[in-house]
Structure formats: C-alpha cells, structure tokens
Curated annotation (Swiss-Prot):
One of its GO terms (biological process) is L-histidine biosynthetic process. Pathway: Amino-acid biosynthesis; L-histidine biosynthesis; L-histidine from 5-phospho-alpha-D-ribose 1-diphosphate: step 6/9. It is an enzyme of class 4 (lyase). It comes from the Bacteria. This is Imidazoleglycerol-phosphate dehydratase. It comes from Cutibacterium acnes (strain DSM 16379 / KPA171202) (Propionibacterium acnes). SUPFAM superfamilies: Ribosomal protein S5 domain 2-like. Belongs to the imidazoleglycerol-phosphate dehydratase family. InterPro entries: IGPD_sf, ImidazoleglycerolP_deHydtase, ImidazoleglycerP_deHydtase_CS, Ribosomal_Su5_D2-typ_SF. GO terms for molecular function: imidazoleglycerol-phosphate dehydratase activity. Keywords: Amino-acid biosynthesis, Cytoplasm, Histidine biosynthesis, Lyase.
Amino acid sequence: MTHRRAHIYRETSESTVDVAIDLDGAGESTISTGVGFYDHMLTTLSKHSGIDMTITTTGDVEIDGHHSIEDTAIALGQALAQALGDKCGITRFGDAVVPLDEALAQCVVDVAGRPWVACSGEPEGQAYVRIGGSGVSYQGSMTYHVMHSLAFNAGLCVHLRLLAGRDPHHICEAEFKALARALRIAIAPDPRNAGRVPSTKGALNV
C-alpha cells in the first residue's frame, strides 16, 4: 500500500479552503477555520483517527460560521476520497463507542463508496445551542451538516448515535471522537486483504 496523501483547494464566493491530509500519519494537525470550537473538533478528529491534517479556511464568518464549517467538511471529504484511492487493502468497516464524562457516542463507518448518514439520539435542544468562547460560535445543528458533507464527499456510510449526554460541548466532542476512532479502524490496512479491494464486487468506487 502506497503512502496515502491528498491535497484539496476549494474556492467559492463564500469561502476558501485548503486541506492537506496524510492517512498514515500520527494524528498531527494545524487547523484554522475561523471557528474556534470547530478547530477543536477537527484537531480531535485528527488526533484520534491518526490522520495528519493541515486545514486553512477563510470565509464569510461575519455572517456566521455555517459556510466555513460546511465547506471545510466538503473539502476534507474530497481529500479523504482522493487519499483512499481504490481502497485496496483497507479494513473498510469501523465501529467505536467513545465516552466523554456523561456523554457517550457510537459511530459505525463503512468506506463503501456509497454515501449515507444517519444521526440520532441528541437531546432536542442540541441543534439550537451555540458553543464557543469569544469569536464565531459553533451551532449544534452543524454537527449533522459536517457528517453529511464529509460522508457524501468521501463516499462513507456513517451511522452516528448519541447514547447519553447532557453538556453540548461533551456531546459534540464524544461524537467527533467516535467518528475518529471508527475511521481509524476502517482506513487501516488489513494484512489479510493486501492488494485486494474488500468487496465481493471487486470495487468500492462504483
């Protein structure tokens, strides 16, 4: 399996996003999106997935963080798809349950090339919460947008379920950590499947 790296540059009237990743890294990251809490979540995603990430986003945060958050996830998903290539030799499936104090999240990932997202279990008010200190806040509803944008651009099937949780920060962080750990397993090389695509179809990109 060759070293799996990718670089994506994406520019629109709403944002400019530059993403570089290394799937076989050590979870090192340099993240700047203009939304502090989102930087924290992406740093967490990098650390616990083992994917090195360098992400720089500038956007119309004077409106709010929505465009910058979503567009960053789109570019990150595109980078994942590029780095995974034909997916030869990967494990393909990953499943993780991660706690953060009172919060508990489960994420199941299939790197199948068939995008799908199912999110459930969050408290009713989570979508309306704004998280962050000074500067641009992160609205709780953006977690679904991130998962959807990431999955549909990377070709992932993602099932994310909050099993318990009260604090909005803890809920988001448990969810991102669960995604990270599930991804770490799914993209890892499977020595028993070296050089082969883990599918009876013989391909995961069609």
